[in-house]
Amino acid sequence: MSSTRIELDQDFIDQVKHEIKPHWGELGWVTYKRTYARWLPEKNRSENWDETVKRVIEGNVNLDPRLQGTPSEEVINELTNEAKQLFRLTYGLSATPSGRNLWISGTDYQKRTGDSLNNCWFIAIRPQEYGDSHIVPTYIDKREKAVSMPFSFLFDQLMKGGGVGFSVVNSNIKQIPKVDNKIDLTVVINKSSKSHDASIKVGAVDKDEWEKQNPDHDDIIYYRLPDTREGWVLANARLIDMHFNNTNPDQKTKLVLDISDIRPYGAKIHGFGGTASGPMPLVEMFIDINNVINARVGKNLTAVDATDICNLIGKTVVAGNVRRSAELALGSNDDQDFIKMKQDKEKLYHHRWASNNSVAINSKFNNYGPIADGILHNGEPGIVNLDLSRNYGRIVDGYQPGIDDDVEGTNPCGEISLANGEPCNLFEVFPYTAEKQGWNLKEAFTLATRFAKRVTFSHYDWEVSRKIIQKNRRIGVSMSGIQDWLLNDLGHRVVTGFEDAVDEQSGEKIKKPIYDPKGIEMVDSLYKAVITADKAYSEELGVNPSIKHTTVKPSGTVAKLAGVSEGMHFHYAGYLIQRIRFQASDPLLPALKECGYHTEPDIYTKNTICVEFPLRAAHADSKNFASAGTVSIEEQFATQAFLQTYWSDNAVSCTITFQSDENDEIAPLLRQYRHTIKSTSLLPYYGGSLKQAPKEPINKKTYEERAALITDDVEEVFTKQNDDQKGLELVGQTDCEGGACPIK
């Protein structure tokens, strides 16, 4: 069916560029240019900000299903005007779509790959049907449950640049049948492949030599991998499924995987972008996964085994230099092997680093001592309260049994509770910036709601996702720079104090937070605006209202664009040095040096340059300003509870930082907020004690001295140097406060 296309004309864009100055943070333009500006081959340069915003907004507005066929003049005018407002909102940096949308929306890759606009996903690790999906193994019926399916889903989404949360709780793992077969795996490669020698070193064998020794293939399953994402996934699926009789119809136990056609290291990846890792990481992954499952022949896989398989997949995906896989493993709270699995340092450094690990709890759970102890040792596990997620939206709206009953887990950063196969779908508004730029906040949040709703009309690759998205239409409208906004509008932080109280169930004495009533009204009114907008738009489109609507995402890279505090987090310090790592060949480096930024070789990675940016937080000199280094653990818990109570009906992503003298408060505070906080994680506050730390707190005098050395605007100098070329790629840059989500 043909469709009408909404486009923004150049005269309008030129007018907006004349009227609105983007609210770049001190790191904003540099972060944008190296992370979200796509290469324009026809112009031999990367995008400028107005071109990125045009691409992104048009890519989104044209998802409105009413544009299929012959839409009315009224619909065309409505969406054209909406596109213009969204352009103004985003160009000025009063709000932005998720980083994933900034990178992918409006590209050919979006049109080809329906999943590409969603940052993160969730899958339950249990046998599942492939169904009507873009990947279905040929050796089984699409309606047959296969152990490989959730691993295939995870592998596919990670390679498309998404993060994946996965559940290995006991109720899922016990559905996996006993391992029937030990598989004899051989990975072969042709001498003509450029990757031949490197692949042999990691365990592959020469194809000609193997053929000589194995002239008879009757008892062998032979699979020659095509040079595609799907080929990698299907090879791994075959390897996993051969271990189980019900998905091994040939009852063969020898598997040969031929990797001769896989492009070599450094070759270009079309679509998502970047360069290939070559087949070597894949060879290692196949061998390692086979060893994990072979070790359980006659027994059941454990939660640790399943997590290892997911981590090995994640490690392989990370080997490509663009995709940064984020994983969250959710285990049972009484599974001590799972909770302690990262204490095996050899396996931690080999692959177990690839996921952040959390445990599933309910509000009756009370054994927080071991969890607090684990957090003190290695910052894990985080906690996810599935009971609250299934039966509550905002806490203030009370118990609503089964309101979100399909929830089984969360995305890697923990701000969206998700059902099996479901993605998060994010857009964030910067209320502090939006107010400064004259926006009515309710209008800004209405535009955000409609943007996110349209993403649910993408063509999704997996049947499990299509079904749950059509049912739930879940969106995640977030706000960032929350501390800046509250401090600006209230004149102080939202937690004004604590009062003595008693926990009604346990009888323990607690300190109950006191919130500024105006702060409550501020977020409550915006929540109601989102609900109203979703209801109206859903009626227009003839679809279900979204099951949940609001969240607080950790932000990070996107918050840097506007220079605001990240999500609900407090600024790391009032004044700080932010260090960002660039590849030594990055064309931004000469401009940064000419502007006076301090640069030096990175002490951890070859061919990498560390650049220091002096930053000042909004309101850094206010007597009511607090940073992550000065705010108490109690106030951070209370602030997260405030947002979960009055703003977010999904969840609130938060990494609470604590000082060494607050260690004993972790377990009591987790217990106190068990009826309020849906997910949280904690990390010790380091305060820049590491050499070349990403963030190093400094005093005002040092900031002023460093800032005085910066003589020019990087964007202007870069343009003058006219050295705009490819290669603007992040090195070791994590997106959110806890480092869980480096997803673009």
From Swiss-Prot:
Molecular function GO labels: cobalamin binding; nucleotide binding; ribonucleoside-diphosphate reductase activity, thioredoxin disulfide as acceptor; ribonucleoside-triphosphate reductase (thioredoxin) activity
Residues annotated as signal peptide: none
Renumbered residue ranges of the record's region Adenosylcobalamin-binding-1: 570-631
Active site: 413, 415
Keywords, in A-Z order: Allosteric enzyme, Cobalamin, Cobalt, Disulfide bond, DNA replication, Oxidoreductase, Redox-active center
Domain of life from the UniProt record: Bacteria
Region of interest: Adenosylcobalamin-binding-2: 690-729
GO biological process: DNA replication
Reaction equations catalysed: a 2'-deoxyribonucleoside 5'-triphosphate + [thioredoxin]-disulfide + H2O = a ribonucleoside 5'-triphosphate + [thioredoxin]-dithiol
Residue span of region Effector region-1: 148-159
Regulation: Allosterically regulated by ATP and dNTP.
EC annotation from Swiss-Prot or TrEMBL: 1.17.4.2
Disulfide links within the chain: 120-424
Chain residue ranges for the region called Effector region-2: 169-318
Cofactor(s) recorded in Swiss-Prot or TrEMBL: adenosylcob(III)alamin
Subunit text: Monomer.
PANTHER family referenced in this protein's UniProt entry, alphabetically: RIBONUCLEOSIDE-DIPHOSPHATE REDUCTASE, VITAMIN B12-DEPENDENT RIBONUCLEOTIDE REDUCTASE
Family: Belongs to the class II ribonucleoside-triphosphate reductase family.
Name of the protein described by the UniProt record: Adenosylcobalamin-dependent ribonucleoside-triphosphate reductase
Organism annotation: Lactobacillus acidophilus (strain ATCC 700396 / NCK56 / N2 / NCFM)
